[in-house]
Amino acid sequence: MKLVKYFLQKKSVTILLLVLVLGGGLFSYVKMGKLEDAPFTIKQALVMTPYPGASPSEVQSQVTDVLEESIQSLGELYYLKTENRAGLSKITVYVKKEIRADEMQQLWDKLRRKVNDVQSKLPAGAGPSVVNDDFGDVLGVFYGLTGEGYSYRELENQAKLIKNELLRVKDVAKIEIYGVQSPTIDVILNPSVMARSGITTADISRAFDAQNRVVDAGGIDAGVNRIRIESTGNFYSLDDIRNMTIVSRTGEHFRLADIAEVQESYQTPPSNKMRINGQPAVGIAISTIPTGNVVDMAEAVKLVIDRFTETMSEGFELQTIYDQGYESAVANQGFILNLIISVVTVVAILLFFIGFKNGILIGSGLVFSIFATLIVMLSQGIALQRMSLAAIIIAMGMLVDNAIVVSDSALVNMQRGMRKRVAILRACSSTSLPLLAATVIAILTFLPIYYSPHITGELLSSLVVVIGVSLMFSWVFALTQTPFFIQEFVRRPRPDELKAALFAGKYYDKFRSALRWVIRHRYATIGCMVVMLVLSAWSFKFIPKVFVPALDKQYFTLDMWLPEGTRIEETDKMVMDMAAYIRGQEETEMVSTYVGRTPPRYYLSNVSFGPQSNYAQILVKCKTSKLSRQLHARLQDSISLKYPEPLIKVNKFELSPLTEAVIEARFLGPDPAVLDSLVGQAVEVMRRNPKVADARNEWGNMSMIIRPVYDPMKAGALGITKASMMESVKSINDGLPVGVYRDNEKKVPVLLKSGNVDITDANSLGDFSIWNGERSAPLSQVTERVETTWEFPQVRTYNRQLSMAAMCGVKPGHTMAEVHGEIRKEIENIRLPEGYTFFWDAQYKDQGEAMQAIAKYFPLAFLALVVILVCLFGNFRDPVIILCVLPLSLIGIAVGMLLTGFDFGFFPIAGWLGLLGMIIKNVIVLIDEINVQHRTGIDLYTSIVEATVSRTRPVLMAATTTILGMVPLLFDVAFGGMAATIIFGLTFATGLTLFVTPALYSMFYKVKGK
């Protein structure tokens, strides 16, 4: 107690330290980062490898498998998933969840080396591979640029000017431009003119190669100087290309413009497209440096953009699509308001229970604990965000609990006639160790979450740290600031004010009577509790299970897939029509569409799809979050009825990454046909369940392909190679690259395209003329046949095994756990041939991994808890009593979940762990008080009764402050379930502390009731 004495005697030091805490807390609040949600690390990387002309199966066997063999030697590898489409290998590398965030960059460097080591083993024409390890970066400030009457090229140029301005803004890390259409120079050949002139495509290719090649012209010596000679002839304008000379086989010279049309165009088919409210657009997505403040960065960006828009040409318009800075500021303001309401509520309750002066005394300790916690948060780089602010609110009741116990004990000692300082020191000495043990145990209950390597553990890590730090500060201030304030501001009762009986009155008498009855009927009481526990466990089957709750935002998204093989232009038409329909709803403020692939990751938990020509995403911004909920619910029910052809998913924003489907039954094996059969059976099971939505095969529908089967004999006689045949075919639509046009710093490909052709099927393709440089022949004369066939548009693997999944969603009003439970047995009973395996993927796998990650550290937390309790009490019976109380907390939780209708998931589980800490804290102090009174010579029965009576006021105060302090969180979509868990659980736990604990104590110590 020397520390307590020091702070009581050294007033100046105490006041200075408290002022420093207040000043440091205010400074920290101003300086610390502000975020919308807690950051977490996406422990994935993408390896993309082009292989033009290869089928999905060829990509998988010749490219992907080679890369996977090298990558799998990474010791940190968890598993690999691949998606192989025509001409493109896409490998997603998942690393072990135990890998720390600060080790990720070194790991990605190792991955790059593994990928680079096998580039020489890839087939000719494949590669190079690109390792994308920053696709998890958040570009949270997202603008869209539109320009009525402007081309995509002009939009791109304007976006680049804006990008150059924004890169100079403080805390801007990188800027990505989305929706840019790659420019081309199309040389559209006229077959009839070429036939008359004798010009072939080979002649044109040779001319481009000769003129566009960069040649070193050397230099000349001029006295003491060496003067470099610059080669010319490069293309710098369209006229340079049009005026290029083409020499025919007969030696005649022609201008290219005489035999072909030269025009500016864009890549066909485009890789992606973006629109805002139906207008063509390009996106400008901006990320913050890791140590930056996104709120400040977003405000600085807005100032630059506001200034820049004043100088833009008329017609250009910049619109905010998503502003993480604004969203963070709004979220912080909402939570700060909730925090203020909680603090005011707690202080008001204290004033009601113990009067103005004592209430302010204890309430001030709460403020000091919060401000000291802010200092630590700043020093540890913990930003103000949803989790850290919620942690302070969750810890609110526990923060005042220590001060309540110390001050109540000191006040009781003074009522017993002790001098003020003696009463304070006696209170601190008798409660410091039990309160420290209880505080440490309350922190230990969160240990499994803190050490969980899963994303959910990382998501909640700041919540655990803030709760732990604030609880320790509450203990420190309870033994320093609280005694000091009692000494300075609380008057010692006069002799005539001393009470003969401290806990007298009709309410105390009624409580004593009830307590004595419980002790007399302890076995019946405990039996009733056990029955209630069994009933509550049974009632959990009626509580919806949703692992991570959705967020309440103005935004939601729609993901749309048309049948595989759909042209991107058709996808764009469909999504434009759908966006126009959504834009016509009264709740809508803005609609932006993204065709071909998802936009940059403007929100951390967003999922990436694409490149896929049949895919599109719609981002809907509503006028308010309430209207967003209304429109989201309505579209869930109606959008698929209005647009039956595509698969449509309507998604709310969530705290953790979404999976491609809610439920995935994944089959692994060597034969795609067998996998297709197994998945078909699983899909049929899903479709029979009325709660299932959009049951489908992960590989999609079979796509039509046209296959010209090259005939070496026939083609060889005509001198036509397979390469020249395929190059000619490519010129029909995509275009054959023959040169480069230099447009400032950009190199624009020059493409040869065949004009006046109308090819839509195998028959018309067979009539198309193929050139060999000397002559032409119809395609049908150089092939065995031109056939139409079908193929899977993609081939997927899991850990180097062919992998195919039956996927489905869940209809509104139902949950994954509910539907999975209904279809699980039948799908698991599907007979698997030898060599084939099955497992549940997606949300089921993710949730199982999260729970396993938490359960992994439960034994450690439990062992630490038991060791502390045994060391504190010096016996086994008291710890066993405490452990027997803990399961009974589920009774209150079950009642709360059923009454409020909240889903039970990861956050309520975290709330339950915190609740256990609160219960343990109360029971420790109660049992310690029983033991203290018994050691003074009071019989054990009386000690049980009187100790419980003496703890009634502090227990009720702590419980009431916690319960009412949590009320603001009840209305938060993310934390409502957690708040309900603590509120109802603690309400029931208060009864456990005051009635069940004495009953258990009397039973374990064989104390007879009177």
Regions found by a protein language model. Give the residues of each.
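Signature of alpha-helical transmembrane segments and their immediate interfacial
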Residues: 1-34, 431, 498-549
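Helix-loop junctions and hydrophobic alpha-helical segments within the transmembrane domains
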Residues: 321, 328, 332, 407, ...
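Hydrophobic transmembrane alpha-helices and their membrane-interface caps
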Residues: 25-31, 344-411, 469, 864-951, ...
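Transmembrane helices with small-residue packing motifs
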Residues: 12, 20-54, 116-123, 449-458, ...
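Solvent-exposed, non-transmembrane alpha-helical starts
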Residues: 16, 55-62, 99-110, 139-142, ...
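Transmembrane alpha-helices and their membrane-interface boundaries in multi-pass membrane transporters
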Residues: 396-410, 431-451, 458-498, 618, ...
